């Protein structure tokens, strides 16, 4: 059973997050291992396994990138275990330049420049995310998979910039 079916939701990228949360809470209550404490060892094990599956499904579906990766996996694109990466050399060069810029900002300890950098990366991420949503809605899986790969780069860059921001603020 796929995660969308487990939560009683259609297998689409855009989903009702409130319904997802409510269904998660219902499933947690229904299959919590403590409810099976007086059951047989097999029932207890099954409850623990089912609870773990529910938690994994929840973590996967509630985060936009992992939800996109999971949806793509249902259509034959296993991005989580694939070995190849982005082949777009212009994009990769841009990522290298952005990483170098972030290193320069760190060396200079320039908070104002970092704030501008974070906004720029967020804008880039948001634009590419919107493109991914359209690609998933149109079921252009191969193109969406490439966009998700690029979003991973931007997400890591954004995370690095935010970590630097915390470091500079604590300094």
Swiss-Prot record:
SMART domains: DnaJ (SM00271). The gene is hscB. Co-chaperone involved in the maturation of iron-sulfur cluster-containing proteins. Seems to help targeting proteins to be folded toward HscA. SUPFAM superfamilies: Chaperone J-domain, HSC20 (HSCB), C-terminal oligomerisation domain. One of its GO terms (molecular function) is ATPase activator activity. Pfam families: HSCB_C. GO terms for cellular component: iron-sulfur cluster transfer complex. It comes from the Bacteria. This is Co-chaperone protein HscB. It comes from Citrobacter koseri (strain ATCC BAA-895 / CDC 4225-83 / SGSC4696). GO terms for biological process: [2Fe-2S] cluster assembly; protein complex oligomerization; protein folding. Residues 2-74 form the J domain. The keyword ATP-binding does not apply. The lineage of its organism: Bacteria, Pseudomonadati, Pseudomonadota, Gammaproteobacteria, Enterobacterales. InterPro entries: DnaJ_domain (IPR001623), HscB (IPR004640), HscB_C_sf (IPR036386), HscB_oligo_C (IPR009073), J_dom_sf (IPR036869). Belongs to the HscB family.
